[in-house]
């Protein structure tokens, strides 16, 4: 909403009780593992979520990420050690562990700092399209004028931009409409998202293999 994500899973909230975090495994498989794979190996690995709707198994993530992640305390603890613990205890009955509030907050803070330090350095085909394009400045300005005039004639409340790259023309469309801005390149879509235009919804979409 207004360029920002909305949490709709309100039923996941519950009153705090002493003890382990029930959703710890789920958080690691749904969020930490995909982000670690994208940052440390290949941005396209987020697509593993399409075939693993309950999250990317930690043993798979641990096998794929580089060995250098063992030197990252957060990834070593929450992916590698976590995966080994799952394997070790999968056929065993485990007594309910005690976990104090301060310990739980320590885990949460470590997860937050680990995720904040995950950066994507990979270059992709469309992420820097408008800087690498063979358009001349005049040709690009002409294209912008053509697009603006066309959009004025259409006068649509909602516009869908297919193959939007980093959203340059989506932003033009957003001057008078709400825009669903789609591209196959996750880096380009992320660049678009970071512009925080409240009238644009950037989406990673592969029309040849829709989910």
Label every model-predicted segment.
Residues 166-176:
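Conserved SAM-binding loop of SAM-dependent methyltransferases across substrates and taxa
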Residues 26-119:
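N-terminal auxiliary segments of SAM/dcSAM-dependent transferases
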Residues 178-183:
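Conserved SAM-binding motif I beta-strand of class I
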Residues 116-139:
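Class I SAM-dependent transferase core
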Residues 155-165:
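Conserved class I S-adenosyl-L-methionine
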Residues 191-211:
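S-adenosyl-L-methionine
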Residues 1-39:
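Catalytic activation segment of kinase domains across protein kinase-like and atypical kinase folds
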Residues 138-157:
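Conserved alpha-helix/loop element of class I SAM-dependent methyltransferases that forms part
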């Amino acid at each position: 909403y207004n360029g920002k994500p909305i949490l709709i899973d309100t039923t996941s909230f519950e009153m705090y009780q002493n003890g382990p975090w029930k959703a710890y495994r789920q958080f690691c498989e749904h969020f930490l593992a995909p982000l670690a794979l994208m940052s440390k190996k290949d941005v396209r690995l987020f697509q593993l979520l399409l075939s693993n709707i309950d999250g990317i198994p930690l043993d798979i993530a641990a096998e794929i990420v580089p060995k250098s992640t063992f030197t990252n305390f957060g990834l070593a603890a929450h992916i590698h050690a976590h995966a080994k613990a799952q394997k070790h205890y999968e056929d065993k009955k485990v007594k309910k562990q005690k976990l104090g509030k301060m310990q739980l907050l320590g885990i949460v803070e470590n997860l937050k700092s680990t995720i904040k330090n995950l950066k994507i350095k990979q270059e992709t085909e469309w992420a820097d399209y408008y800087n690498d394009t063979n358009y001349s400045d005049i040709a690009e300005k002409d294209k912008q004028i053509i697009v603006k005039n066309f959009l004025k004639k259409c006068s649509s409340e909602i516009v869908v931009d297919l193959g939007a790259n980093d959203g340059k023309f989506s932003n033009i469309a957003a001057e008078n409409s709400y825009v669903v801005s789609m591209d196959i390149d996750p880096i380009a879509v992320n660049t678009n998202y970071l512009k925080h235009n409240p009238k644009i919804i950037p989406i990673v979409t592969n029309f040849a293999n829709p989910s």
